[in-house]
């Protein structure tokens, strides 16, 4: 699979994320040029889960740094956001 973009609702806003499929079976979630995290289907292939940060191979990209003073939404990969991302990946 190739890199693609998705849009998800985040609060009252909509956020565009870049999704980078990995050979290891997970999808890196890129936001403003940094790795926000990664998602994958759990063992039963029914539910999406967040990949622990120490299991993500960063490669050439830095991890995203949260900055509350920046002029952008501070997206957090909570359970709801992970589910939305997974639904968009399979849409």
Model regions and ranges:
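Negatively charged, low-complexity tracts enriched in Asp/Glu with abundant Ser/Thr
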Residues: 1-27
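Short hydrophobic/aromatic-rich beta-strand segments that constitute the beta-sheet cores
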Residues: 28-29, 50
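Acidic, low-complexity intrinsically disordered segments
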Residues: 43-91
